[in-house]
Each structure stands twice: as structure tokens, then as C-alpha cells.
């Protein structure tokens, strides 16, 4: 093809060639501007294309991509209706149709350790992020509550009881690790582990009185705050004639027996639960208590002795003020005691003097006073509902580990539906940003946090909004769960604060994303010692490292965020390409595929698309099906185009050299004429076959200049052209324009200074006063990663 030289743009041969290409571009535009062939068909008529069923895929891999693109514009794919269609495309299934999970009765609950980071990290790693994390807060606008019995999803109908049993073990393991609160009553929960400083003011402090009973003191007060009566104590150490029916009356207010009954039936038999009543009596209730019997007996005691109980409540004198103790013990003792009319102590085994309840029937064992190690009782600044907001089920830990279970928490009510929340955004690097921030030629080490989300503590009032259950007990997340959209944002703040301090303290290039840390340094031996120091530094602050996923020593090739990264290039693993080619080969021409399945397919294509010679416009037909929620049918040429994309695999350079070439070609258009001007003084004016919108005429001239001259950059006075967002154009033209203009830079020049503005108006070009600017938005890179 002739290239323009000095004063050569007016040559007749070049003009004839340019006019020929211009007519081809105009025909491509005009064939689709009148009627868009990709509009959804509301019925599956005979016009639906279904040739070549069973035809093997033999694409001509030697053919240029431009030829394959043009063939796809002739043999179009089709959009169908909303009737049921195929949900499987190779190994891909619909996005909302999960692969059937198989229940494993031998599932093991993974080892979960107490992840309590030291609040000294606020001083060691100064950052404004900590005010959002110590503690984190979660305030949904509205909440839908579900019954406790619906806590475990019926994911495995044939193994309901076994599924609930393993979920119960899993939740108990989380509770033992200090990740969950366990509900005792409407105003009282218990947890294990070291309390945070914001929890200390809500801790229930129990003191031993001389007669052996325990009193529950909240912030130094022993009054009944519900009735707002004068400070009266129900328990007197020298009162030997206390009526045993007072147990039933106390249960009317804040009875641990009633809370046990409300938590569901007894499916698991475990250790006796110790709970503190505000009146000073502590009743041990076994978890296998019968809920109906317990509730009925408490009701009977309340009805029979309500008047006598109230009068005795008002006549009691306070025993004196207990001073607020600052030393909180690490264990809570709860004695199971009662008073008979004769003054004898009644144990849970003696059922003659206590009201008939679940505690008197099923608590024959473990009725002696017990000590709960490292346990705390907390009366939060909120009520603890006996309902749940999320549901649970178990799956395999991953495809390689099917012996251990993974707990899936469904808090989707906070991300969709009437309770949907708008969670804050956070910086997430795309591929272009990652290419620009990664250092070249440095050894790298990858660190991975263990139980990353469980490092993030929640405000107790926020925890009450994140309630789950195994069908028997109600638990609340004390640490951030994985099923809430706020958790990734909190984790981003957490790791960013740590990464900034690591980079400053150890003088190493550090990049963090979610629970991954990437460390780079020119000296491999120095980087190895730094990585050990970083691990020690984090572990001293109570932050746990997953050494199974951590790079043991500096390496040159590393897998990070799904990319294979070496010293100079980024690429996609070959196994991923093979899987994608296999899926494309299994596409049946003319078969209807459900839009959810297409959505899954497009997600995989989008990930690999930057590593091909294609562009996003090539996927527009599938996006149209997803947007309209209709079925999709592949044509033979379109399937060949997708396969061709996976054949031209390329690798991307890390830290690509940014060049700003000087513009030598300018274009301009009017509704009737278009002009191309070269810096050497040559120019050409071409007439359009018909009048169209001005932005289409401008784009036609820019595409023509790219075909005929092949410059490194082009000047244009159309912002529509310079932004390269052509999704509003017909698919044929948009795909070709994107393909032509992606490799080159487009500069915006005001019409007043556009050198091609003169030739389009039959005036000479003027390159003397040239003012231009690129309109591409600068990629945002955090300040700490700039200049490294």
C-alpha cells in the first residue's frame, strides 16, 4: 500500500486507494445504522441461524485477525428469547447455578486459632485507618430476621442432621477461638479469648459473696434497671428463708432457663452452660434441656407465685455496695445453688424444692459448680435478638482438599434486595496499574495472612446484626465475617496500614492486596532476611502468617493475583488457555445458551482479553444477551473469532516505556467532506457518500488515516473519537474501529488549531500554531507506590 511522502497525499493512485477504503467503511456503517441486527428476537423463528451442527472447529489460524473479524460481521450470532436454554457450556455452568455439592460425613473442622492482634499495632504502624478498624462498625439500614431453626441451609436433604452437627462443631470451634459471641439472654452473651478495651466497660463482673453464691455486677450497679426501682438487692447473704419459688419469678425477667428454651431443641449434649442472673442466683442449665418443659414450668411458677414474689422483691434490703474491680479475672465461676424454705441448699439434682423445669430433668450430670476457662460475660450496649440474619452451610475447603470443611456464611440480604447497602469503594489494581507499579528485575517474596478476616474486631452493637445459628444456639460474629460486603474494605484498610509500615521500616518495595503481601528488593539475600524480620514483626503484633502459602525464599517467577509474573513480563498460565480453548471447541453452533451461562463465559474471556489481540467490542453480542437477559446462539464465524483470540497469546511487559510521539497526521470532517493532513504539507479531501452524524464522520476519517498512513498518533478535534468509547455504535463498525485505533494514541486538538480544519473547508493546512492534549485518564497509583 503506498505510503505518503512529501507532498504525496494528492497523488491520484493514493486517492483512488483511499476512496475505495472509505466506501468499504461507509458500507459497513450504513448496513447497520438503519436496522441493528443484534436486537433481541422475541420468538425463535425460522430466521434463527442453526447451520453446521456438529461441524468441527478448524479455524484458519494463519488468516489475519482482521479477516476473521470481517467474517464474523457477516455471519452474525443471534439473540433469542427468555425460554429455558442450556445451562452448561463445557465445564462452565450458569453463574447462579452452583455445581452440586456432595456431603462428606467425614468432614473435619479445620484448626482455628485465636487471632487477636495487639492494639499496640496502632502505635507501631501509625495510620488513619485504625480509627475505622478498632473497632469496625456495621450499621445496616434495615434487617430481615429469620427463625433460629432456619440457621442451617438445607443444602444436603439426605444428611440434614449430620450437616447441622458438623456446623455446630464448626461454630463451637469459632466460639472457642474468640471469633463468635454466644447468646445467653436478651442482654447477655459470652465469649472466650482476651477482651478488647472497648469491651471492658460492658463486661459482667461476678463476685463471690460469703455464703458461696455469685452476684452479677454491671458497671458497679446491682439494681433492676428495667423497673427503675430504688437500688434493692434480691440476694442477701444472711437470708436463710428465701422462697424457692423466687427462682421462677426471677426467670420471668431474665431467666437463663427461658433463653435456653428459646434457642431451639436440644440436639447436642455438651458441657453445662453457666449463666448469671441479675438477682445473684446462678442456675446451671445443660444444653440438652427440653425447651417446652422448661418454658412451661417457668410459666407455672410465675403464675402461681407472682404476687408473693413481687412483695418479697420490694421488701428486700440491699446488702451493700461492691466496689468496682479493675482486675478482671480470666475465668468466670458459676455455682448452681438454690434456697429451700428450711434453709438447705438445693442442687440441680434435687427436684422436690425447685419448680419443675428442664434443669431438674436433664441436668443429672455435670451439676456441680464448674469453671469456664478464659470465658467472659458481656452485656453489650444493644439487645441480642434470638433470631438470625444469615444462614450457613458447609462445602469442601477447596478442590484439592475435600477432607476439611469450609463454612459458607450467607449474609446476602445486605448486598441485594430491600436491605441492600452501598459499601465503600477501595483501590483495587487493574492489569494496567499492576504493570506500572511492579519493579523490573527484582527477586520477590509473597506472604499470605492466615484467617485474614478474623483479625478484624467488630463493635459489639454491630455484632448483634450478624447473627447465625446451628439450629440450637445463636452466635454473633465478634470478628468480621467473610459473607459481608464491608469485610473486604476493612481488610484492605488493615493490610494497607501494615504494608505502609513494612515498606518504611524495612526499606523494601511492598504491595498489598487483600491478604497477600508482595515484597521486592534488588538483593535476594537481603530480601530473604527482610522476609524473616517482617514475619517476626507481624507475629509479635498477633498477626498470623499462613506459611503454607508463603514463598519460602526469594524467587524470580511468582504467581500473584492469578498472573504469572517473571522479572520482565506478565502472562497467563498455559493451563488456563487450554481450558478456555476446550470450552470454545465445545460450543454447539445454533444451540441456545442461557444468559447466566454466557455471563460466566464472558468473565473468563475478560480476564484473558488483555493478553490477546482482541478488544472488548468483540464481546458486545454476548453483553447484549446478558443485558437483555435473553438466550444466546453462537454462529460459526463468531466461534472462530473467539478461538482465534485464544491462539494469539501474548505477554505483557512490566513497566512499559511510555512514549509520547509527535503528531504528524491530523483529520477533520464536516457532514459532507473529510480531510487528512500530513505535517509535510500534503493533504487530501474526500467526499462522503451521504450525510451522517458528525461523530461518525470524524471516526470514519480517523480510521481511514490509520489504514492508509499507519501513523503512531493522530490529531482529531472530536472528543468522541479520542476517548475510544464506541459501544453506542453498531457492532460491526465499533469492533473494527476499536481494532484499528487501539494500538495508536489519539490527541485532542481544538478545531481552531486543527491543521486539517483548513483542507476540510478548502483552505490550506496550518501546522504552525499547534496545541493538543491526550484525553486518556491518568492511571491512579497510591502515593507510596509512586516513583519506586
UniProtKB/Swiss-Prot annotation:
UniProt GO molecular function: DNA binding; DNA-directed DNA polymerase activity; metal ion binding; RNA-directed DNA polymerase activity; RNA-DNA hybrid ribonuclease activity
Pfam families linked to this entry: DNA_pol_viral_C, DNA_pol_viral_N, RVT_1
Gene3D superfamilies from the UniProt entry: 3.30.70.270, HIV Type 1 Reverse Transcriptase, subunit A, domain 1
Keywords: DNA replication, DNA-binding, DNA-directed DNA polymerase, Endonuclease, Hydrolase, Magnesium, Metal-binding, Multifunctional enzyme, Nuclease, Nucleotidyltransferase, RNA-directed DNA polymerase, Transferase
Region (RnaseH domain (RH)), start-end ranges: 656-788
Ranges for region Terminal protein domain (TP): 1-200
Reverse transcriptase domain ranges (all copies): 376-565
Region Spacer, residue ranges: 201-365
Annotated Mg(2+) binding sites: 448, 515-516
Span list, region Disordered: 36-56, 220-242, 288-380
UniProt-listed Enzyme Commission number(s): 2.7.7.7, 2.7.7.49, 3.1.26.4
GO biological process, one term: DNA replication
Notes on activation and inhibition: Activated by host HSP70 and HSP40 in vitro to be able to bind the epsilon loop of the pgRNA. Because deletion of the RNase H region renders the protein partly chaperone-independent, the chaperones may be needed indirectly to relieve occlusion of the RNA-binding site by this domain.
Region (Polymerase/reverse transcriptase domain (RT)): 366-655
Residue(s) at site: Priming of reverse-transcription by covalently linking the first nucleotide of the (-)DNA: 96
Substrates-to-products reaction catalysed: DNA(n) + a 2'-deoxyribonucleoside 5'-triphosphate = DNA(n+1) + diphosphate; Endonucleolytic cleavage to 5'-phosphomonoester
Function in brief: Multifunctional enzyme that converts the viral RNA genome into dsDNA in viral cytoplasmic capsids. This enzyme displays a DNA polymerase activity that can copy either DNA or RNA templates, and a ribonuclease H (RNase H) activity that cleaves the RNA strand of RNA-DNA heteroduplexes in a partially processive 3'- to 5'-endonucleasic mode. Neo-synthesized pregenomic RNA (pgRNA) are encapsidated together with the P protein, and reverse-transcribed inside the nucleocapsid.
Domain notes: Terminal protein domain (TP) is hepadnavirus-specific. Spacer domain is highly variable and separates the TP and RT domains. Polymerase/reverse-transcriptase domain (RT) and ribonuclease H domain (RH) are similar to retrovirus reverse transcriptase/RNase H. The polymerase/reverse transcriptase (RT) and ribonuclease H (RH) domains are structured in five subdomains: finger, palm, thumb, connection and RNase H. Within the palm subdomain, the 'primer grip' region is thought to be involved in the positioning of the primer terminus for accommodating the incoming nucleotide. The RH domain stabilizes the association of RT with primer-template.
Entry's family note: Belongs to the hepadnaviridae P protein family.
Protein name: Protein P
Organism: Duck hepatitis B virus (isolate white Shanghai duck S31)
